[in-house]
Amino acid sequence: MVSAVEPKTYFLPRQDLAKLLDRLHDGGRQVIGPTIRDGAVMLDPIERVDQLPVGWGIDNAPGKARLVEQHGSRVFDQPPGPSSWKRWTYPPRLTEFAWTDAAETDAAPAPRRPKPVPAKMAPQAFLGVRACEIAALRVQDKVLLEGPVVDRDYAARRRDNLIVAVECAVAGGTCFCTSMGTGPEVRGDFDLALSELDDGFVVRVGTDAGRAALEGLTLPAATSDQTAAAAASVARVRAQMGEPLPMDGLPDRLMAAAESPRWAKIAERCLACTNCTLVCPTCFCTSISQRSDLDGDGASAERTWDSCFTLDFARVAGGNFRTRVEDRYRQWLTHKFGTWWPQFGSSGCVGCGRCIAWCPVGIDVREELLAVAPPVAPAADPPPIAPVAPMPSIVPSALTLPTPTAEGPRPMPWRTVEVLDRRRETRDVITLSLGTDDPGLLAGRPGQFVMAALPAVAAPPISVSRFHPDGLELTIRAAGPATAAIVNLERGDTVALRGPLGRGWPVELAEGRDVMVITGGIGLAPLRPLLDHMLARRDRIAHIHLAYGARTPGDRLYVDELDRLAASGVIDVAQTVDRAGPEWLGRVGVVTQVIDRIMCSCDRTIAFVCGPERMMRATVDVLHERGIPDERIWVTLERHMDCGVGLCGHCQLGRYFVCKDGPVFSLAELGPAFAVEGL
């Protein structure tokens, strides 16, 4: 993308379209455009004009998209097909990083660490980009270029795009871009824009790159009749789509309907087949899979498109947050039309209608939005109806793409650290002491986490359980193949870390207050750095109460450490177990029963809570009974994470990505989302 130039309008005779195609190929550029493949209009590399869908249309409706031969000479008389430009800017499959040997020294063998794999592709021209699809590119730019990190592969691919837009001449039965304010008019962010007439194309120039693509074609200026005919064609398309959906207040209406019975009704039809997310031009969720050579010498991580409709999308070691189809459909619809707004400043839907046409059971999001979140009747008589005018765009404006050498937010590099010590905490929990002098790793805050990677296994998120001047500790339960591999590391082994990531505990809010630290099982690990921080500043904290629950006495973490703290009297330590034998002389019961015995001034108490979410919800109920408000109750959440920086989409909870906006939140921030099952 480059700066726009003064608009100029030309006319391209139909027989000269081949010449324009040749110009688009100049400089080794690959041209991507619509063509007929597998019984549909797909986006593929185009070498010749006869590969374009000349004389073909599409008859589409909910659950239906059929090619229709029109026996004419028009090229772009179809609504969008199932493939989108996302396939070329954000490929369905690519190698994210490969394991390489670090610099070897005489003193030690070279440790292995992940290294990003740069994008390799020719510059591209996109021919036939609709207005809604330009909006989709803007939306993806916002997600992948303006987040906490820049997706370097996406940035490289977008930087070399030449956009040849096409204004729609027909509206499909599933199109609703007028409702989303994204079309059918092509308003900007193009290099060239074509409006197809029977004998040729009205051509608008949007950038210097677009003007350069027309050099040598000696095109005449478009006549007033030609420009009027082009405008009338787009106006007919707008009229064909009918009355726009009532979008005012939709995000709030959707979130207020989180427990509507309509979700279960939709789930009776929804197959959770993922078609809607795969054809969507803005969905960005991905998963990382590990690949390993048979000889063990090579390993890499492959990023693939994923979908919030898959069963394992929200699975973590302790269970699955969205087992029901209704929860997965709710996640998709509320994200697209609701929580995308606070996350990225726009809707996640551009109204292309692909999800409706390519749903095998014909679920129509337009109908479901009206059923789940009907518009609120106005309190007074509405004002007189004004003349129809184009709806304002609800997508972000064009973005300046980073140059290859631009400094800016990017994923943290992987750092190789050495295992200095290995300590068993319980039968299935190990604490690893890791040595490093990397200032980034050592600068973490209590409550942050790292991504830990070994060749050929997934890189799980792991909370830091202690920071040292010369390293850090990770306390890990062997809950799956990845954590089992990390737990089995021995002294002298190495592991790659990226981080620390996320938002930690608000330690500054504890000063001058009574503090309750309430946790269960391995949930003590992310709270341990918080305890370290408060103990180092003990004179600034009023009272510190630790309530710790475990399944059995043998499942407690840091036993000797907690016993020393309890004996010192520096903090009040209360431990309880769910069940125990006669050798256990302590409390038996759930941790919420311990909270009732804590003596504190609740009008100045702050609570930090970590554990299974059902345990945390029960704890919150008890804290509320004691008068502690949501603003002073802080929790840390567990969610599936493949990236740690808000790009994979797995960890979404309402308006938040747990990895980058959390994992620590106050109850006031989470609001009702904390209590809704399956969200």
Stretches found by the model and what they are:
Residues 225-250, 278, 294-325, 575, ...:
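A broadly conserved sequence feature marking short terminus-proximal activation segments
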Residues 130-135, 268-287, 303-316, 345-362, ...:
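Local cysteine-cluster metal-coordination motifs and their immediate loop/turn environment
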Residues 378-399:
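Intrinsically disordered, low-complexity proline-rich tandem-repeat tracts
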Residues 247-268, 286-382, 623-626, 667, ...:
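Ferredoxin-type iron-sulfur electron-transfer modules in oxidoreductases and energy-metabolism complexes
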Residues 154-169, 551, 629-650:
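Short, flexible loop segments at boundaries between secondary-structure elements
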Residues 2-255, 263, 535, 543-556, ...:
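Iron-sulfur-associated redox domains of electron-transfer enzymes in respiratory
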Residues 481-642:
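FNR/FR-type flavoprotein reductase catalytic core
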Residues 404-496, 550-552, 579:
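Ferredoxin-reductase
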